Amino acid sequence: AKTPKLISLNAQTGTTYTLVLGDADKLVEMNNAAANTLTVPPNSSVAFSTGTQIIVVQKGAGTTTIAAGSGVTLLSKDSALGIGGQYGAATCIKIATDTWYVIGDLA
């Protein structure tokens, strides 16, 4: 039987965080009572492999917004990039050099 892959957690408590290469295929937890922003950096800064998935969870009460770094395109339903509420989540999936899908609980 294939052993399931366990996901690693990156707990963030600040109001801003920019993804790093070590976040690939991990869960990033944003835990702040104030509004906070997670930025997806351009490939020139952080060269994630195409197909990389990163789950973002809004643990705190402050709304987590997913932002595009310089030259990055984020594709989401209705262009929504704010996580829908506390304990809501979204997944960022890299589909091209500087293009990502953002799917999940977005408002």
What are these regions (language model features)?
Residues 89-93:
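Short tryptophan-centered beta-strand motifs in secreted/extracellular beta-sheet-rich domains
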